[in-house]
């Protein structure tokens, strides 16, 4: 505990001991992060919602055997990533181009970009246009690069954690993130 707030790992251990409120707190803390990661890699909200349920059921099933070897976030996003990959393989959606204007509530990147102390309507509108361009550019990334980028940007994972989540080497994760950033820079330069 730090400053009276349980770490995610401590909450998971409490949940393993039967504390349902600890699970509810973990869900509250990580629901949007996991949902956004899945939604940005899938075609529709229904599939995302279904996978969300599967991920959190998996968390509940694995609670008794949970060992805080890695950060909880890394472990959780590994569960989400594995279910995502299984779904993509089963449905052959490797070339997915998601819809930005799907009315989703999980536009964290847009919110962060648009909310950067923009108070003037013109500045806010321009910022929202830039954010929409970023999301459109993210959609154009190959699946492996998009996943690496989103795990870093949304999941706040390190390269080592991205490698762990995606079951790749550190160098592969590093390359995917580097190529993703390079392509995003190129695509966004074309936008400007």
Where would I find each of the regions flagged by the language model?
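Helix-turn-helix DNA-binding module
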Residues: 132-172
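Sigma70-family region 2
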Residues: 16-17, 40-45, 54-71, 90-92
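Short, Lys/Arg-enriched C-terminal cap helix and immediately downstream tail that follows
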Residues: 38, 89-92, 141, 146, ...
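Structural recognition of an alpha-helix C-terminal capping motif at a helix-to-coil junction
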Residues: 50-57, 70-82
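Short, charged helix-capping/linker segments at alpha-helix termini
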Residues: 2-3, 16-25, 35-54, 170, ...
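Amphipathic, Lys/Arg- and hydrophobic-enriched alpha-helical face
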Residues: 27-45, 62, 138, 183, ...
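Arg/Lys-rich amphipathic alpha helix in sigma70-family domain 2
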Residues: 61-68, 78-99, 127
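Internal acidic/polar
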Residues: 4-5, 94-124
């Amino acid at each position: 505990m730090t400053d009276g707030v349980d770490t995610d790992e401590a909450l998971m251990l409490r949940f393993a001991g039967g504390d349902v409120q600890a699970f509810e707190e973990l869900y509250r803390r990580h629901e949007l992060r996991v949902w956004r990661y899945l939604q940005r890699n899938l075609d529709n909200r229904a599939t995302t919602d279904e996978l969300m349920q599967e991920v959190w059921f998996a968390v509940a099933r694995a609670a008794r055997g949970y060992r805080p070897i890695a950060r909880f976030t890394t472990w959780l996003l590994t569960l989400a990533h594995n279910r995502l990959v299984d779904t993509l393989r089963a449905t052959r959606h490797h070339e997915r181009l998601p819809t930005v204007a799907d009315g989703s509530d999980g536009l964290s990147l847009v919110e962060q970009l648009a909310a950067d102390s923009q108070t003037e309507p013109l500045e806010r509108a321009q910022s929202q246009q830039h954010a929409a361009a970023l999301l459109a550019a993210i959609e154009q990334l190959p699946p492996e690069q998009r996943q690496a980028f989103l795990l870093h940007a949304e999941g706040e994972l390190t390269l080592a954690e991205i490698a762990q989540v995606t079951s790749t080497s550190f160098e592969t994760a590093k390359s995917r993130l580097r190529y993703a950033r390079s392509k995003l820079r190129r695509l966004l330069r074309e936008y400007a």
